[in-house]
Amino acid sequence: VDVDLKANTTKAENYRGSGNVYGQWDFLKHFQFKAMFSLDYASNSTRTYTPVIQVYDASVEGDIATLGNGKTGVSQAKETEMKVQSDYLLTYTNSWGDHSVTATAGFTTYYNKLENLNGARTQGVGLVIPDNPDKWYVSIGDAATATNGSTQWERSTVSVLARVLYNYK
C-alpha cells in the first residue's frame, strides 16, 4: 500500500472562542448577589480527498488490486456549536453568638446549539478528481454520486437550587 497517497488529504479550519464574566454585589450587610455568564463558540470546516489506492495481491490477475470503489472522491463538512450558560446566586450570611447560618438560592440556565452540514462526490466516467486542494470541493465530480447529510439540534435546561447551612459553635 502506498501510504503516501493518504498523506495530506484533509484540509481543515477550526476556530474557537470562549469567555466568561461575572459581577458581584454585596448589600444590606448580610446579602450577596452574584451573576455569571459564559459563552463557548466553535466553527469547524473540513475538505477531504479520497485517492484511488492500489495494492499488490497475488490472487488477482496482474497482481494489482484496487481498494474501495476505485474512484477518487471529495467530501466537505461544516459544523458550528454554541454553548451559553448563566448563573444567578443570592446568598445570606449571618452569625450571632454561637450560631451561624448561610443560605443560598440560585437560578441557572444552559443553552447548547449544534449545526452540521456535509456532502460528498466521487469522480465521473473519465473525470478523475485531481489530488489538488484547490479542487477539493463537492461542486466537482459526478453529480449523480452526490450524497449529503445534516445534523442540528438545540438543547436547554433551567435549574433552581437552594441550600441552608447552620452551624453551632
Predicted regions located by residue number:
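Outer-membrane beta-barrel transmembrane strands
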Residues: D2-T48, V74-S95, T102, L114-N116, ...
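Extended hydrophobic secondary-structure segments that form protein cores and membrane-embedded regions
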Residues: T102-T108
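Surface-exposed loop/turn segments flanking beta-strands in extracellular/periplasmic regions
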Residues: V1-V3, P51-G70, E115-T147
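Flexible domain-boundary/linker segments
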Residues: S38-D40, V52, F107, T122
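Extracellular low-complexity Ser/Thr/Asn/Gly-rich intrinsically disordered segments
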Residues: G68-G70, Q76, G106
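Glycine-rich, aromatic-flanked loop segments that form ligand/cofactor-binding clefts
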Residues: T109-K113
